[in-house]
From Swiss-Prot:
Alphabetical UniProt keywords: Activator, Cytoplasm, DNA-binding, Repeat, Rhamnose metabolism, Transcription, Transcription regulation
SUPFAM superfamilies attached to this UniProt entry: Homeodomain-like, RmlC-like cupins
Biological process (GO), any one: rhamnose metabolic process
GO molecular function: DNA-binding transcription factor activity; sequence-specific DNA binding
Any single Pfam family the record assigns to this protein: AraC_binding
Stretches assigned to the HTH araC/xylS-type domain: 181-279
DNA-binding region ranges: 198-219, 246-269
Site positions (Interaction with sigma-70): 248
GO cellular component terms listed in the entry, alphabetical order: cytoplasm
Name of the protein in question: HTH-type transcriptional activator RhaR
Primary role: Activates expression of the rhaSR operon in response to L-rhamnose.
Organism expressing this protein natively: Pectobacterium carotovorum subsp. carotovorum (strain PC1)
Length: 284
């Protein structure tokens, strides 16, 4: 198999204010297309709005508001197909953090499976975290002793609050969730199963028109388009790592007709599912 491409390496001296600072915030409002890269620092990525394709260690994620990633220094990732994507990267040098905290648990690194480093936030969690991130953004632009300590203390607060409010992408609907959060959770849980938006709204006594409009405003996509993107990202993952037939993969990703799946996949990525899979097969 061909050697994995490492891409660009982002250096600490280009992103941290001084060699004393161990925490920084890289604001990306918007986040442009950015090529494959890795770092010599770790980062916590929080997506606020818009959408894009996050390719992380060769696994595709269709990201939008509420997605959160714990990215380690050795991870390789890129951003593609971005549309109004806004996110913050909270950068930190793990081995230079001085506060007595269980950093390995609060900010899981490369020793944890990738599936345990992708989480989602609801509206309440996003509002709470955004306030702390904004405070850190201001504090980390100073290098006096008190500001350095305050920056690390704010990172600890962010890590604790993230652990409190985060949930897995396929988490069941939460009874106290906001309408938009409930819809996002339902869509993430409907990759393999049919999803009927009108029935969902009727079941929860939501205004379909209002919710549809708010979803488009926050994500930059319609509900059907977002669900299709989730399904296509799952298909990309299965085509890379699973040996099931194209038809079986189509069914697992919510497409009843494998021919239709092939057409949609080709329209999205410019290549057929079988040709895409061929790229990742071992070459003798």
């Amino acid at each position: 198999m061909a050697t994995a491409v490492r891409g660009l390496k982002l250096q600490t001296e280009d992103y941290f204010l001084t060699d004393k600072n161990v925490v920084m915030v890289a604001e990306r409002h918007p986040q442009p297309v950015f090529p494959l890269h890795h770092h010599d620092f770790d980062e916590l990525v929080i997506v606020w709005r818009g959408n894009g394709l996050h390719l992380w260690n060769d696994v595709p994620y269709r990201i939008t508001r509420g997605d959160m990633f714990y990215v380690s220094a050795n991870d390789r990732h890129s951003y593609e197909s971005v549309h109004g994507l806004e996110l913050d990267n909270i950068l930190y040098i793990r081995n230079r953090l001085t506060l007595s905290a269980d950093w390995q648990r609060l900010l899981p690194g490369g020793e944890h499976p990738q599936s345990q480093r992708h989480w989602c936030l609801g509206s309440e969690g996003m509002d709470t975290l955004r306030e702390k991130v904004d405070a850190l953004r201001q504090e980390c632009m100073k290098s006096d002793a008190l500001s350095l300590q305050l920056s690390e203390a704010l990172l600890l607060q962010i890590a604790l609050l993230a652990a409190r409010y985060r949930h897995t992408p396929d988490n069941p609907q939460l009874a106290d969730a906001h309408q938009l959060d409930m819809l996002m959770n339902a869509l993430r849980a409907s990759i393999a199963a049919p999803f009927r938006f009108e029935a969902f709204c009727e079941q929860h006594h939501f205004s379909a028109r209002s919710l549809r409009s708010r979803f488009k405003e926050q994500t930059g996509m319609s509900v059907p388009h977002y669900l299709r993107q989730l399904r296509l990202c799952k298909a990309m993952e299965l085509l890379r790592y699973d040996l099931q037939t194209i038809g079986d993969i189509a069914a697992l990703c919510g497409f009843e007709d494998s021919n239709y799946f092939s057409v949609v996949f080709h329209q999205a990525f410019g290549v057929s599912p079988s040709a895409y899979r061929q790229r990742f097969l071992n070459v003798e």
